[in-house]
Amino acid sequence: MQAPLQQLFDRGSLWLGNQPNHAADQASFVTTGQLELDQALGGGWQSQRLHEIQVPQFFVGELALVAPALMRATQQKRPIFWLSPPAVPYAPALAQLPLAESERQQAQHIVLTPSRPADALWAAETILHSGQAGVLLLWAEQPSAIAIRRLHLAAAESGAYVFILSPWQAEEARSYATRLRVHLSQDSVTGNGQVQWQLLKRTGGWPLRLARQALPKWPGK
């Protein structure tokens, strides 16, 4: 006999479309630095999952969303891998992260710039299978569904926070835990830049858009 629906909900075997799924271990989450986004994601970024951040152009505040994950990796003495970034990571900004001096000195940032997209995907998969990474950031223009599936499986074994940063992509089924699209606009009164988060996919909830807000700031500024 099937268990009553309520028992299935209580065990976390089922979820309601308008409610986040809290069955996951909260210790595996790290904040995005944005309260409403954390709530929509059930706690923030989850480790051992593949998260996509789609941007209309790079460096519009998206790195502020992953800064807390960089801090956690540093505190855990695990290296941070930057794969095919569009620019060299800005060392003075990384030095501003609110870490203890001993933690800051032991930070490991490894930048790899493969010449071909296929090599970058191979490097990402290899790094994740090694189990050494704390965070992996991969910039990819149009990764294939097969490549994403392979990275999804590798991320599940890695213990790392894994992010794919890309231009806007087609809204087709992909093996991501999170698909976040960044929309930019200006406040009609002040003229200041604003951002709106659109979650195309999230664990334990339907897609949604959050209210517009000011561009996120890098921690320590």
What spans do the regions from the language model cover?
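Detector for small/aliphatic-rich hydrophobic stretches
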Residues: 1-82, 86, 93-106, 201-205, ...
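Residues that form or flank phosphate/diphosphate-binding pockets in enzymes
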Residues: 61, 119, 146
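A short acidic, amphipathic alpha-helical/loop segment
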Residues: 65-69, 123, 147-151, 155
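Long, charge-dense
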Residues: 79-143
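Short, hinge-like loop/turn segments at secondary-structure boundaries
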Residues: 98-101, 128, 154, 174, ...
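A short secondary-structure junction signal
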Residues: 122-123, 147-150, 175-176, 209-211
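A contiguous pocket-lining binding segment that forms or flanks enzyme active sites
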Residues: 128-173
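Phosphate-binding/switch region of NTP-binding enzymes
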Residues: 166-221
